[in-house]
């Protein structure tokens, strides 16, 4: 069967470029990473010393619980992004079911998004180890992630990825209906244990879903933080997250409107013929 022509969205992402401070992603490191992230991280209570736990107030215990939730959910997010890459994106290219250009439009900047989340996860992991699993200060880590040049870069990458989400889902659905080999590949990939019974249509939206969680988690950490300077800096990082989320939402709306108009134009053209 002849492969259908690729109908891309009206706007294409810019070239990937590089993060202001991060190294270029090393793709060969990602596959072992998927194995590394297969098991959930150990809860902080099981790793902290009994003496350290006994000294914590009720409010500080709650703070540590939310920090642990941020860490554990970032771990889970890196894992699912790696599944998207290693179970779907790379094999689709290897099997020549999608070209590199098509993949760059369906999964724009996926490699760099994984690297950014992985670096954030590693910075949280280092805090846990340095503080014997009872984290004293998290404000610098989260401000470095969501504020300043790194925050701007994160916003740029996530805007590209999330704004193509609706179009990507539609393109994949269309390909599955028209191309038997493509459909068989997707079904086989979705059956792999790494997907944990999720379909590709469930995995693609995870970046947008993750962006909605950061402000809530950071506000909850700030609410349970006694030190006023630390509290203020965490609230600043939460505000940075809200700005990123609002910007991404606007980009998503713009692209969805373009996608709808493009679809209507194609339908009207086909009807006239």
Question: Where are the predicted features?
Answer:
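An all-alpha helical bundle fold corresponding to the catalytic cores
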Residues: 1-272
């Amino acid at each position: 069967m002849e492969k259908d022509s690729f109908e891309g969205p009206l706007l294409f992402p810019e070239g990937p470029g590089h993060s202001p401070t991060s190294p270029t992603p090393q793709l060969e490191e990602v596959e072992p990473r998927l194995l590394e992230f297969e098991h959930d991280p150990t809860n902080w209570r099981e790793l902290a010393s009994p003496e350290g736990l006994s000294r914590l107030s009720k409010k500080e215990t709650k703070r540590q619980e939310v920090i642990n939730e941020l860490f554990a959910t970032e771990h889970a997010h890196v894992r699912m992004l790696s599944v998207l890459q290693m179970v779907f994106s790379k094999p689709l290219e290897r099997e020549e079911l999608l070209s590199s250009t098509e993949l760059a439009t369906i999964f724009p900047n996926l490699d760099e998004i994984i690297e950014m989340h992985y670096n954030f996860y590693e910075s949280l992991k280092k805090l846990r180890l340095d503080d014997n699993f009872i984290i004293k200060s998290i404000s610098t880590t989260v401000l470095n992630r969501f504020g300043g040049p790194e925050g701007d870069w994160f916003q740029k990458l996530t805007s590209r990825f999330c704004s193509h989400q609706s179009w990507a889902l539609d393109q994949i659905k269309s390909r599955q209906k028209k191309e038997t080999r493509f459909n068989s590949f997707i079904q086989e990939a979705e059956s792999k244990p790494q997907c944990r019974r999720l379909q590709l249509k469930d995995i693609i939206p995870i970046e947008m879903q993750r962006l909605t969680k950061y402000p809530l988690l950071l506000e909850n950490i700030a609410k349970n933080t006694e030190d006023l300077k630390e509290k203020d800096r965490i609230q600043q990082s939460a505000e940075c997250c809200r700005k990123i989320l609002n910007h991404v939402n606007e980009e998503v709306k713009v692209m969805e409107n373009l996608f709808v108009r493009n679809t209507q134009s194609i339908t009207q053209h086909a009807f006239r013929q």
